[in-house]
Amino acid sequence: MFKREEIIEMANKDFEKAWIETKDLIKAKKINESYPRIKPVFGKTHPVNDTIENLRQAYLRMGFEEYINPVIVDERDIYKQFGPEAMAVLDRCFYLAGLPRPDVGLSDEKISQIEKLGIKVSEHKESLQKILHGYKKGTLDGDDLVLEISNALEISSEMGLKILEDVFPEFKDLTAVSSKLTLRSHMTSGWFLTVSDLMNKKPLPFKLFSIDRCFRREQKEDKSHLMTYHSASCAIAGEGVDINDGKAIAEGLLSQFGFTNFKFIPDEKKSKYYTPETQTEVYAYHPKLKEWLEVATFGVYSPVALSKYGIDVPVMNLGLGVERLAMISGNFADVREMVYPQFYEHKLNDRNVASMVKLDKVPVMDEIYDLTKELIESCVKNKDLKSPCELAIEKTFSFGKTKKNVKINIFEKEEGKNLLGPSILNEIYVYDGNVIGIPESFDGVKEEFKDFLEKGKSEGVATGIRYIDALCFKITSKLEEAFVSNTTEFKVKVPIVRSLSDINLKIDDIALKQIMSKNKVIDVRGPVFLNVEVKIE
Ligand code: ATP
């Protein structure tokens, strides 16, 4: 905490001095917790749900009222709506199926099988029979069967499961049997039911919308088709409603998403639930795929289908594919990857990789950590001392009553060289998925590498870690280790850097995996010629 009064007094006396000196009160974060190794964490929404939300608001702005339609539709309704074409539509529907409930009796043979397992059946026979009967009748759920059998026979549930498996094989190898119920393949199946019921309850005209899931038994999923998708559908019922309402609604919706590039094309499909010549497809342009994508279909329901549902006014329906719209808005080339990114490759960008390059060893104690800063500054200042030469840094640490004098000696004995090698100021960058050490200046860099390194510096993400920074942390963490183990001297010698570990750096496994699988590189080569001798007294 700041000593506020002292600071204010200092500032009153000499503002400039106080302003500069109080700078040290703002403690910098330690290197592994510094930017870009820290990254803001925020939640992320799904593009499909975002589009659904935007479409809901768009419909509401246009005066529509929200409804939820039945998801499960009896095939009879499809016949009612499509007439002779129903089979073609049902072909794209999923039917709901379930496992049959076998009629299993408690024969003498079964009783003796249970008794062979060491269980007395006689006094429990009746309750066991009741359970089997209840299951057949549907009063007992399948997932309660084992528990109920175990309770009836007063045995453990493990034994109950064994009996089910060994004595009642009828429950195994059951094959699902289809019902006449289907999962809706488009919202229309539900609109007929909803509009029909509202006819006597709601004054005309009315404008309804629903954004919900539909299911299609597509032969195969592809870049614009999924087995399950969302339809943002609406129905307008009332005298005078016609195809022009469809065009206006399509424009109203799409223009709220910023689309100006769309076209209406009469649908070749000519579904029997639409009035002839009203079924129209809406296409929007996908800039990345460079093709027109069908995003919606609209039409006026046929008076034949409407009459069967007791509806005696025109109803215009428009069904817009949410995923298709999300694909175009978010510039996704494949609906499968957009909806289920978790099943596809996840690429870390350079910013992500930069947050994963960290110092391997960093001293824990503040005094030793702070010495690193001093060490780095001295090394940078004296890096070009002509050899033979040495740079000595001395420091005394107090731990309770004990004092430790530390002498760090950085030296170069060979004649005619510099104290430190030329790559000492190289900084680690992440560029195009590569982790690279980039020199301060490009003088003397081979022509073939220049372009790549220059681009790395201007377009890549800087980690803010130079070789000398990481190496000095290596020296000070070794010093900390020496204190703990009572070692009195040690040496650090790094002539040429070849890998991250040579300069006390590490990288997260997921970044490393990506670098390897994408044929990217970690190139931190370079001569640093660091020789250090440390003595502790
Ligand atoms: P397509 O010709 O592209 O297969 P469709 O003519 O069968 O589509 P409609 O029955 O008119 O589609 O459905 C209305 C809208 O629902 C389509 O314009 C489309 O945006 C969307 N849609 C239909 N089927 C799928 C699907 N399998 N996956 C994603 N969206 C779909």
Curated annotation (Swiss-Prot):
E.C. no: 6.1.1.27
Keyword set, alphabetical order: Aminoacyl-tRNA synthetase, ATP-binding, Ligase, Nucleotide-binding, Protein biosynthesis
Short name of one Pfam family: SepRS_C
Disulfide pattern: none
Principal EC category: ligase
Superkingdom of origin organism: Archaea
Family that this chain belongs to: Belongs to the class-II aminoacyl-tRNA synthetase family. O-phosphoseryl-tRNA(Cys) synthetase subfamily.
Matching Gene3D superfamilies: 6.10.250.3340, 6.20.250.20, Bira Bifunctional Protein, Domain 2
UniProt-listed InterPro entries: aa-tRNA-synth_II, aa-tRNA-synth_II/BPL/LPL, O-Pseryl-tRNA(Cys)_ligase, Phenylalanyl-tRNA_Synthase, SepRS_C
Catalytic activity annotation: tRNA(Cys) + O-phospho-L-serine + ATP = O-phospho-L-seryl-tRNA(Cys) + AMP + diphosphate
Keyword Protein biosynthesis: yes
Job of this protein: Catalyzes the attachment of O-phosphoserine (Sep) to tRNA(Cys).
Lineage of producing organism: Archaea, Methanobacteriati, Methanobacteriota, Methanomada group, Methanococci
GO BP terms, alphabetized: translation; tRNA aminoacylation
Record bears the keyword Ligase: yes
Annotated GO MF terms: ATP binding; phosphoserine-tRNA(Cys) ligase activity; tRNA binding
Residues engaged in binding substrate: H186, M187, T188, S231, A232, S233, Y273, Y274, N317
HAMAP family, per the entry: Sep_tRNA_synth
Assembly: Homotetramer. Interacts with SepCysS.
Protein name, UniProt field: O-phosphoserine--tRNA(Cys) ligase
